[in-house]
Amino acid sequence: CNSVKAPEAILPIPEAKQVEWQKMETYAFVHFGLNTFNDREWGYGDSDPKTFNPTRLDCEQWVQTFVKSGMKGVILTAKHHDGFCLWPTQLTEYCIRNTPYKDGKGDIVRELSDACKKYGIKFAVYLSPWDRHQANYGSPEYVEYFYKQLNELLSNYGDVFEIWFDGANGGDGWYGGAKDSRTIDRKTYYNYPRAYKMIDELQPQAVIFSDGGPGCRWVGNEHGFAGATNWSFLRAGEVYP
């Protein structure tokens, strides 16, 4: 029989890693950190690290629960807007190594990523671009700090299936004691193409989340449900110049 040429695609088609991400269907999101111990959702950036002192934390128990519920991965808030880091970074004192947890020798990013490997589910990280603790937020120096943090997370914890960049950017914060409000241009300040290049080089299988993609995006609400017939359009104009 005569061969028939496949028609050209008339709509955008997903990359292979986006297809794999969709196949996961459900995964857990762990919003945990210094705020957990200070009754805050969005920390101001001024909470004392000494208040972070979980005494019965068991990341393996977390992952076992996720596995039993049918989830295929987990994403962790490695750093939320308050700027506190759940890994022992050398880039700031505002991190887990200056807490009572395991006498400053803990690393929850490591503990959770290792538990994921042990029980066979995927691991991902959330890294807030906005940082209400750092005195230099809003300057070019902070952007370099942000990229060094991103490099640490991409280089030291094995494979990650997603990198989550939150859309909340700029506003009031502690900022090294200045206690003021700072405004940035979210489309240009972080130079996101640089982030995408770094991720493609260090974690090529990872899907990138932001308000507008390029891998996947915010569903549009925080109720846990997408609207009916959600085509997951990537609203690039909200994030990129």
Predicted regions and their residues:
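Mature catalytic domains of secreted/periplasmic carbohydrate-active enzymes
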Residues: 1-241
